[in-house]
A protein has these predicted regions:
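Membrane-inserting effector segments that mediate pore formation, membrane fusion
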Residues: 63-113
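Generic N-terminal initiation segments characterized by hydrophobic and/or small/turn-forming residues
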Residues: 3, 36-37, 50-51, 56-57, ...
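An exposure/low-complexity boundary signal
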Residues: 30-33, 48, 53-54, 99-100, ...
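Charged/polar, solvent-exposed surface patches and flexible loops
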Residues: 1, 76-80, 93, 97, ...
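Charged, low-complexity surface segments at secondary-structure and domain boundaries
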Residues: 58-63, 80, 168-173
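Single conserved hydrophobic/aromatic residue that forms the stacking wall/gate
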Residues: 1-8, 12-13
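Amphipathic, membrane-inserting segments
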Residues: 10, 15-47, 114-204
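A glycine-rich, hydrophobic loop/mini-helix early in the fold
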Residues: 40-68
Length: 204
C-alpha cells in the first residue's frame, strides 16, 4: 500500500541521529506528483535543500489509447485494464460479435459507426457502435477510486480485413487532476493516526 510504504519511511526518519532531525526540523513533505507517483521529502536541510526520502510508483496494467488492437488483444485488454461498467460490457459485447469485414460492412458518418454483428449461429444484424463510452481504466494507485473518462470507440479494417479496435481519450486529461486529488485524500485518511502526524505535510 502507498500509506504503508510512506509510513515505513517516516519511521526510519524518526530513527535518524538527533543532529539530522534538528537540521530538518523534524518535518517532512509528502507530495502527490502525479496519478502514479508519490514522493516523501525531508524538511529543509542546512543547505536549504530537501532530500528525497522515498518514492512510490503505481504498478498498473498497460493500455495504449489511440492504438489499434486486433480482436483478441482488445477483448483481453477490456477485461484486464478496465473496471466492470455497463459501457465496458457494451463495448466488449460489440467487439466480440463483430463479423470479419470481408463478410460484413461498416458505415461511418464521422460521429457514429454502424457495424454488422453476429446475433446467432447464422444471423447477422446491423448495430450502432456506442459512442462516446464512459469507462473506468486502472490509471492510478489501486487503493484509491479510479476516475471515469469518456472515450471514442472506433472500429476499422485491420490486417487481412480483420476488424481492429481502438479507444481514443475524449476528456482532455481531466482525469489526472481528479486522480491526484483521490490519492491525496486517501493519504490524509490513511495517515491520520500516524504518530507525529502534524509533522507531515501532504501536498498535491
Amino acid at each position: 500500500e502507498i500509506a504503508q510504504c510512506l509510513v515505513g519511511s517516516e519511521m526510519c526518519i524518526r530513527d535518524r541521529p538527533t543532529d539530522d532531525r534538528q537540521t530538518t526540523g523534524g518535518r517532512n513533505n509528502m507530495k502527490v506528483v502525479s496519478a502514479t507517483k508519490v514522493l516523501l521529502y525531508s524538511g529543509l536541510l542546512a543547505e536549504r535543500d530537501r532530500e528525497t526520502l522515498f518514492e512510490v510508483n503505481a504498478l498498473l496494467p498497460q493500455f495504449e489509447y489511440g492504438r489499434e488492437y486486433d480482436q483478441e488483444s482488445f477483448l483481453v485488454a477490456m477485461q484486464s485494464c478496465f473496471q466492470t461498467t455497463d459501457d465496458r460490457e457494451a463495448v466488449t459485447i460489440m467487439a466480440s460479435n463483430i463479423v470479419n469485414t470481408q463478410q460484413g460492412t461498416f458505415s461511418d458518418d464521422g460521429v457514429s459507426q454502424q457495424a454488422i454483428i453476429k446475433t446467432g449461429v447464422t444471423t447477422k444484424d446491423a448495430a450502432f457502435v456506442p459512442n462516446p463510452v464512459s469507462l473506468i481504466p486502472y490509471r492510478t494507485f489501486l487503493e484509491v477510486p479510479q476516475p471515469a473518462s469518456d472515450f471514442v470507440f472506433r472500429i476499422s479494417e485491420g490486417r487481412g480485413g480483420a476488424p481492429a479496435f481502438k479507444l481514443v481519450a475524449a476528456d482532455g486529461g481531466l482525469w489526472k487532476s481528479q486522480a491526484v486529488d483521490n490519492v491525496k485524500n486517501y493519504l490524509v485518511k490513511a495517515l491520520a493516526d500516524v504518530p507525529d502526524r502534524e509533522k507531515i505535510t501532504i501536498i498535491a
